Regions:
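Hydrophobic alpha-helical and helix-loop surface patches within well-folded domains
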Residues: 2-263
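Short coil-to-beta strand junction motifs in C2/discoidin
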Residues: 263-272
Length: 272
């Protein structure tokens, strides 16, 4: 872990501990070892992004990496830990295996959004990270997803100018991460990890599309993941399910949930 000479050395200790343990965790969780001999984490005094997952040389804004052992509050430590775990997960999702084109950006960012919670919950169970996952970003994601014209998690990109619009924290990050938690819960932890291990082993140093991942999870679980998840990532919005009773039967129906004016929608989602 690196910083400028203006920083005290002890502000690097927390990041070093989290980074070291995160790599060990991912090695075991993914079943595929971190492929490089070293992982550098560099705090930059003037860095517009929060962090960037360059392979083997991750760069951070100073506030996203450095923690004073006496002055930094726990809330800031939790934030720093999730940023480190997020960027390190990209060493697998994004660097070891890279999406074929920008329409599958979610293969990088949705997974990193989920894995930062998976990793830090395992490393710091006393922080109860899944409580944060259930509240952080969710309201913004639901609000954004209820607007007409919002992009889907997997969105077409036909021109380089469209790439930057994909980095929507409410959709590709927050919504996508929670859809992955849905499929993880659906097929179970063992099948999920088996599918990921197969995915990394088969596609290491290659490019993939979303269906490559769904196929590995489908093979590992025996469940129809491809059709299920493509419906969720390829269409914008979210369903609201209504229940009505008729004599002794319950009738369930769904429609896309909107806030404000909107065009009619016939979108349907398979509910796992």
């Amino acid at each position: 872990v690196w910083a400028t000479p203006a920083q005290n050395e002890n502000t690097l200790d927390f990041a070093l501990d989290i980074a070291t343990r995160s790599i060990d965790f991912y090695d075991e969780y993914f079943g595929v070892k971190y492929p490089l001999p070293k992982s550098n984490h560099v705090a930059l005094p003037d860095f517009s992004s929060g962090a960037m997952e360059n392979w083997g040389l991750i760069t951070y804004r100073e506030s996203c990496l450095l923690a004073d052992p006496e002055l930094t509050p726990e809330s800031s430590r939790r934030f720093i830990a999730t940023v480190i775990a997020h960027e390190l997960s990209h060493q697998w999702f994004g660097n070891l295996v890279t999406m074929q084109w920008w329409n599958d950006l979610w293969l990088n960012e949705s997974f990193a959004n989920m894995m930062e919670y998976v990793a830090i919950d395992a490393l710091q169970p006393d922080w109860h990270m899944w409580e944060d996952f259930a509240t952080n970003e969710v309201t913004a994601a639901l609000r954004r997803d209820s607007l007409d014209g919002v992009q889907s998690v997997q969105a077409d990109v036909n021109h380089p100018d469209e790439i930057s619009t994909l980095f929507d924290p409410a959709i590709v990050y927050a919504k996508g991460g929670r859809l992955l938690v849905m499929v993880r819960k659906l097929i179970g932890e063992e099948a999920f990890r088996t599918g990921l291990k197969s995915y990394f082993e088969k596609f290491a140093y290659k490019n993939t599309v979303g269906n490559d991942l769904w196929q590995e999870l489908e093979s590992a679980s025996g469940q129809p993941i491809i059709n299920l998840m493509n419906a969720w990532i390829s269409q914008p919005g979210l369903p609201v399910v209504s229940v009505s009773s008729s004599h002794d039967a319950a009738i369930l129906s769904q429609e896309r949930f909107f806030i404000g004016e909107h065009q009619p929608s016939d979108a349907l989602w398979p509910i796992p």
